[in-house]
Amino acid sequence: WLCFWLSQMGAKVVGYSLEAPTNPNHIELLKLDIISIIGDIRDLDKLNQVFSEYKPDIVFHLAAQPLVRLSYENPIETYETNVMGTLKVFEACRANNVKAIVNITSDKAYENKEWIWGYRENDPMGGYDPYSSSKGCADLLATSYRNSYFNINEYKKTHNTLLATCRAGNVIGGGDWAKDRLITDIMISVSQGKKVSIRNPKATRPWEHVLEPLSGYLHIGQKLLEEKVEFAEAWNFGPSDEGSIT
């Protein structure tokens, strides 16, 4: 959806990711007018090669191992991808003088207090399961780079990069056929004439359509490219309280 939106606005889009993990997938259906490169974010040499060739002005970093249950089954890959992969994306940005980085993590990066209030951007990072913990680590990594290498007080003096982190959660929308997604599991079960299996029927979580947080990511990206240093920090993106809980 982000690639589609950017290309519709006339941006030259270079995508870097693994092969589409699900079938069907909207990447093939949309026939996007983008440059698509198959690669792993843990491969720093290839990242540097791609960045050097295409010289991006802005990087939206969304690549991740995004599944909680899979993180229990394969914690090493989860941490390698979500933490070390993020580190290598930042290093490629640093080596190639990228102007703006929009780093996408998750609302699961926060330490879960089990309280009724929403989380604020300055609440502590945490993470009970390997996935959530890896996202908290990635967020701390972004904070470190923002302080160490992309410090706004040194902007235009020792570096030319602004880094913002965006946190959203429970994003739904067309094209998401990944495992362990509630809406996806319901659609698959109904289409196959099977009973719907609900893992945590008492759980309540806020939902938002994919275009909602994406509009926020694009807004932050625009502000960074406009050299608005006050936007180089962490941002939450979530739905309103009314009508957003299931």
Language-model features: locations:
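PAPS/PAP-binding and catalytic site of the sulfotransferase fold
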Residues: 5, 245-246
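Short secondary-structure junction motifs
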Residues: 99, 229-232
